[in-house]
């Protein structure tokens, strides 16, 4: 696992956007051989999306031959609901780049048969071989997508009951009313994530410090979903200074020295 320790949230957004655009350009995608990108929602990736849009506007990256799969979606929200992830992605990213809308894939939280929808999503991912690069964030309790603590590390895309802590944290998007936050969501599984060729996780803020410590210094266990990343051969975590507060000084020094050339990538 690689850790890229940066200073600010803006640095994480800039670094990750540049890394993603470089990965796409290096792959040289075509219609017959698209670059497959896994995407999250939320405040942390929002800044990365803004940077990617800026790179697109400068002509430094194209999404014409990129296929995307989002991590998760609430159950029961209409696509145009202000807090649906469908609306988030179209409003904050897809509508501002040259991606083909038919190449964007999101779980349908309104499907009549939710389990069948999850199976369909898994099959769709497999139809492209694998996801080339999966971007993700992490919750304060270490969850990735909606894989809450105690999720199976071999799990696949499925219906998931949201933990109270997650619903409470997300209530800020629902007028601070936890009763408006859906109790169920569709999410890719940990096993689904680990099948990606490469994973890039964005971690920012002091409230994510325990999760980062678990990911880097902890043992693999199902109560901290983020620790599953230790099992992946090509994971990168880009983080800001605030999120490193729980790391040992020697750990942070080790990665800072090891990645000094890549930190200079900014």
Swiss-Prot record:
Q: Looking at the UniProt record for this protein, which Gene Ontology cellular component terms does it annotate, in alphabetical order?
A: cytoplasm
Leader sequence segment? none
Keyword Hydrolase listed: yes
Q: Which residues form the active site?
A: 72 (proton acceptor), 141 (for ring-opening step), 143 (proton acceptor), 148 (for ring-opening step)
- A Pfam family this protein belongs to? Glucosamine_iso
Q: For this protein, what is the EC number?
A: 3.5.99.6
Query: Which reaction is the catalytic activity of this chain?
Result: alpha-D-glucosamine 6-phosphate + H2O = beta-D-fructose 6-phosphate + NH4(+)
- One record GO biological process: N-acetylglucosamine catabolic process
**Which pathway is it part of?**
Amino-sugar metabolism; N-acetylneuraminate degradation; D-fructose 6-phosphate from N-acetylneuraminate: step 5/5
Sorted UniProt keywords: Allosteric enzyme, Carbohydrate metabolism, Hydrolase
Where in the chain is the site Part of the allosteric site? 151, 158, 160-161, 254
**Homology family:** Belongs to the glucosamine/galactosamine-6-phosphate isomerase family. NagB subfamily.
Checking PANTHER family in the record gives:
GLUCOSAMINE-6-PHOSPHATE ISOMERASE
- Its name, as the record gives it, is Glucosamine-6-phosphate deaminase
């Amino acid at each position: 696992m690689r850790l890229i320790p940066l200073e600010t949230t803006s640095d994480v957004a800039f670094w990750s956007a540049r890394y993603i655009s470089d990965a796409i350009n290096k792959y040289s995608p075509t219609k017959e051989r698209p670059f497959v990108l896994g995407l999250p929602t939320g405040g942390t990736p929002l800044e990365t999306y803004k940077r990617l849009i800026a790179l697109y506007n400068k002509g430094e990256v194209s999404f014409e031959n990129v296929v995307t799969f989002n991590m998760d979606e609430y159950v029961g929200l209409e696509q145009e609901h202000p807090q649906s992830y469908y609306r988030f992605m179209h409003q904050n990213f897809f509508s501002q780049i040259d991606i083909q809308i038919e190449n964007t894939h999101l779980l349908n939280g309104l499907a009549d048969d939710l389990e069948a929808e999850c199976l369909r999503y898994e099959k769709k991912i497999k139809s492209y071989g694998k996801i080339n690069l999966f971007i993700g964030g992490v919750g304060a309790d270490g969850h990735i997508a909606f894989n809450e603590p105690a999720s199976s590390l071999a799990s696949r895309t499925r219906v998931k009951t949201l933990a109270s802590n997650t619903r409470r944290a997300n209530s800020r998007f629902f007028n601070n009313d936890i009763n408006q936050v859906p109790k169920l969501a569709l999410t890719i599984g940990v096993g689904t994530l680990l099948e990606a060729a490469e994973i890039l996780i964005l971690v920012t803020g002091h409230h994510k410090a325990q999760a980062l410590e678990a990911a880097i210094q902890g043992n693999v266990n199902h109560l901290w979903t983020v620790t599953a990343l230790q099992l992946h051969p090509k994971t990168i975590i880009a983080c800001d200074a605030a999120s490193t507060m729980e790391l040992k000084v020697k750990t942070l020094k080790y990665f800072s020295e090891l990645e000094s050339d890549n930190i200079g990538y900014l």
